[in-house]
């Protein structure tokens, strides 16, 4: 598959400022606020000038049940902190309550995360962009009828299902430290989606992703798992990622790629145990981008939130082929980035337990499996189903969904200041022990509340009505003429 260097590609970016207001609760490592921090940082780097920014629609229950079971989505719509006692049996059944708590606005949070990923897939399908970015998406642990690892609705599966309407083969790549179990499970028996996950394996959540898990039925050999040990560094990661992904591209020949960019694989993550720098992590983005395929970039885990914001800002710049300085610009959360106030981070001195021999052995085993694939399986394409977001078809009688607007918003925090710290009594700079790791359910990214100078809207009719009263949310809007 042909690779290109330095080809500038059109990028669109999905963000809703409300996402940063949702709050999982005291001491919970998943902080949607990190999405707002990311957004604010990339705004202050000026990256908004180089891409189209959209506010996603809120995905509805009908969209979510394209994958999830009706009763599970009905439960997510109904459950609230004030009625939990009425749902105790269902909470147990759907694995909601501990790692996946009930919090105010839970379903709306899922709607925003999912809406951005599905809208991104529609944009890619219509060839209206080359790369779509939704840092609030990437919630890869959610199952068909179960929440898991801080994830409730699997926006990735729903986005891939949307891409499959136009693409014969879709490749999913996961560089989060946790195994992408929810996505693998959804497509385990199909040859139209290949899932590739590089993750920590052994005494670690979710406990899946063995080298020998390769898919089943028609999907045999279409699941690729690279189990890793603690402390992998940039050099080792690049040495496995590039050859494995080159072979996958050669054998599978996808026509679209979804890349989950979980940043808990970075050095110093509160729940992680890898030793990647932001540059090392972003090399994966750069390499996948070089294949010049329609690409969806999603968030995922990441629990040291200052580094999450650094990482996803830098990876947005990589998508835009734009170099940004290491000196951080002043931004609303500048104090979080002390004491150095730099974009890039240094690796720690932790031991890399992944020996060259171990990595080579796993790589060769994966190559053997990939050689079992038929070259680019043919797929009988059916009539293309309706797009998930019909209003994007641009009915002339409706308001222009692409009008530019300027949004000033006062972002009020829904928690005390210390809630946004990285350590929270759970060991500043200290890694959790393995028993905690098992319990430490993966954290997936949600959105933020800051709005940007130029933001495009993609909304349903219902939401257009709501938008007529922006003051209800403390948001001032004015149309900005292009």
Curated annotation (Swiss-Prot):
1D-myo-inositol 1,4,5,6-tetrakisphosphate binds at residues 27, 31, 270. Residues 390-482 are annotated as: Disordered. Signal peptide: none annotated. The modification N6-methylated lysine is found at residue 432. Sumoylated on Lys-444 and Lys-476; which promotes enzymatic activity. Desumoylated by SENP1. Its cofactor is Zn(2+). It comes from the Eukaryota. There is a cross-link at residues 74, 438, 444, 456-457, 473, 476, 480 (Glycyl lysine isopeptide (Lys-Gly) (interchain with G-Cter in SUMO2)). There is a cross-link at residues 444, 476 (Glycyl lysine isopeptide (Lys-Gly) (interchain with G-Cter in SUMO)). The keyword S-adenosyl-L-methionine does not apply. The modification N6-acetyllysine is found at residues 74, 220. The active site is at 141. Ubiquitous, with higher levels in heart, pancreas and testis, and lower levels in kidney and brain. Keywords: Acetylation, Biological rhythms, Chromatin regulator, Hydrolase, Isopeptide bond, Metal-binding, Methylation, Nucleus, Phosphoprotein, Repressor, S-nitrosylation, Transcription, Transcription regulation, Ubl conjugation, Zinc. Belongs to the histone deacetylase family. HD type 1 subfamily. Histone deacetylase that catalyzes the deacetylation of lysine residues on the N-terminal part of the core histones (H2A, H2B, H3 and H4). Histone deacetylation gives a tag for epigenetic repression and plays an important role in transcriptional regulation, cell cycle progression and developmental events. Histone deacetylases act via the formation of large multiprotein complexes. Acts as a component of the histone deacetylase NuRD complex which participates in the remodeling of chromatin. This is Histone deacetylase 1. It comes from Homo sapiens.
